[in-house]
Each structure stands twice: as C-alpha cells, then as structure tokens.
Amino acid sequence: MKILTETPISRPANGIPDVNYIENDGGAPSLCRKLNKALEWANEQGADWLCWHHDDLEIQTPELVEPNLRRAYTDGARVAGVIGALAVFVPQWWMNNRPVMTWGAIIQGYKDGREQLMADQPGYNPNMAIVDGCALWIHRDMFDARVEDYVNHLYDDDICFRALQRGYKVACLDVRCKHLSEGGYEFRDYQEASDRFMDYWRARAEFPVISGQKFKEVK
C-alpha cells in the first residue's frame, strides 16, 4: 500500500515519514486549494491513499493505519479520518448533537499544556457522514475530486460529501492521534464559508446528510 502524506503547514509531522509540505504558491493560498493540489500530486505519484493532516497532529499508532485502511476499503469507504459525525445538520457539526452524533477519538492539546481526550464513541465505524480535516485519508478513487473553495474551512465536509455522492462510504479509523492545536477561527469568515457551503450542497442533498443517502441530480 502506497500512502503519500501531505500537510499544509511547514513543521514536520510525527508518526509518518516522507511528509510533503504544500507551499503557498501555484494558486494554493487556501486550505481548500491546497487539498485540491495535494489530490492532483498524489494522483501523479500513483499513490493508493493520500494522508492529509495538520502539521500539529501526531499519529501515535501509525502501525494501525494500513490495517484500518484495508478494512475501510473493503467496507466501501474512500475517505477516512479519526473523529467525525454520523449526521450533518449544518456544517458546524461539533456544536450540534454532541455526543450523540459524533464518533471517534482524539487527544486534544491546548496552549496552556492541558490535554483532553475527546472520545464520545471511540473505535472503527464505516458509516460516517463526515470526518474532521485534521487527519484525512483519501483513496485514489477520489483523486479526481475537487472541493469548492471555502478558503480555510469545510474542505473536510466537502470531500466527504463528494465520496457519499459517488456512492462510497466515509470511515472513522481506530487510530490514536493527538492534535496539539487549540484551533480557532474568525467566526465571520467561517459563517461566510458555511453559508456558501450550504447553498452549494442544499441543491444536491437533503439535510441531515447521513451515510448511504441518495444525492440530487443537478443540471
């Protein structure tokens, strides 16, 4: 299995070797454009899977990645992650129906040194609606997909929806990761991206979006 790893930030990531840094050039000033560039590059390299993750994410059990990906592929998944949602009502899925609709586990680190285990429903699940973009594995069957440009937001929701739209599944892997960043964003920028995301996908899907549902034809 050939897994290529790319990160949109410059610091080397722990847990997986041969990380390729996506620079802010070549028309890729946003995380969405960077992901599209990464998909194009992975396709050119003949990879089986693209591993896309933030530079501040540490994969603590890298030996479990390939077995989980084989299982996910067999189950029909072409996008995978480590934590996500079983249904999407609006893009801000962390703020809705947690812990009922979230699945997976991740160790979240904070700037003051604290750590919190987020594990509402840990373990493997091949029936996700979306998985979080801090760690994504995308199969070559999706390398021709391109996400809409929401600048630095919602690329994870978009690539997951595109997999579901094609009849594939999205899986949560049983892989332990530690995300060192506290995250954060300008709410106004996020809200603008969210509005554009919903305008695009409301024309193509019935909300809430869940695994296995049919998407609309758009002419």
Kindly label every feature range from the protein language model.
Residues 1-24:
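N-proximal low-complexity "stem/linker" segments adjacent to membrane-targeting elements
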Residues 26-35, 39, 152-153:
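A short, glycine-/small-residue-rich helix N-cap motif at loop->alpha-helix starts
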Residues 36-49:
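Active-site nucleotide-sugar/metal-binding loop of Leloir-type enzymes
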Residues 47, 76-78, 168:
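Short, high-confidence coil segments that cap the C-terminus of an alpha-helix
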Residues 47-58:
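Short beta-strand-to-loop acidic/aromatic patch adjacent to the donor-nucleotide binding site
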Residues 68-144:
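Conserved catalytic core of nucleotide-sugar-dependent glycosyltransferases
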Residues 149-219:
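C-terminal catalytic/acceptor-binding lobe
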